[in-house]
C-alpha cells in the first residue's frame, strides 16, 4: 500500500494502539519493579518508484548464463541486492562491475574490501553488494523518499508505489524508538 495513504495511516494507528496496550499492560503489571520498556522498529520505508531487473540485465549482458544458472546469483533485499559469483565465473567480475557502474539505477557498489565496511565477509562467493539510486522526491501522499527495488523472481511482494526497505536511502534509515521506564536519564 502507498506510504501516507489512508490505508497506511490506518495500519500505523492500529500498530500504535497495540504498542500503547502493551506499554500500559507492562506498567500495570510490574508489581513495583523498575521496568525499562523499549519499543523499536529495525528500519523505515521508502516508496518503490521502479523495479530493477538486475538478473535480466546480467543475462542480457552475457554475464549470467540464464535465469536458473548458479554461477552468478542475485539475491534481492528490496532496495539493495547481493551478487554471488562462483569460482568458475570469477573472470566475469570486471564485466559485472562495469555493468553496475554504467547503470543509472545503481547508486553504491560495495566489492572486495569495501564489503567489510557494510558488515560482510570478504572470503565468500559474495562479490557485490549494491544499493539502488534513490531520491528525495515524494509520493502521491507527500511522503519523501523514492527508491528502486531490485526484482526478486521468488517473491511478488514488491510493488510500484508501495513501501519497501533494504537499502541505504535516508528515509528508510529512520526507525522509531520509544523508551519508557525508570533508571534511564533524559537525553541519554
Question: Where in this protein do the model-derived segments appear?
Answer:
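Generic recognition of stable, solvent-exposed alpha-helical segments in well-folded globular domains
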Residues: 7-10, 14-17, 21, 48-49, ...
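Active-site neighborhoods of enzymes that stabilize oxyanions during catalysis
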Residues: 70-188
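Short secondary-structure boundary/capping segments
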Residues: 2-8, 52-58, 143-147
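Short, well-ordered beta-to-alpha junction loops that form the rim of enzyme active sites
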Residues: 1, 41, 131-134
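Glycine-centered flexibility sites
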Residues: 20, 43-44, 163, 181
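A long, amphipathic alpha-helix that forms part
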Residues: 1-37, 95, 162
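Acidic/histidine-rich catalytic neighborhood
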Residues: 25-26, 33-86
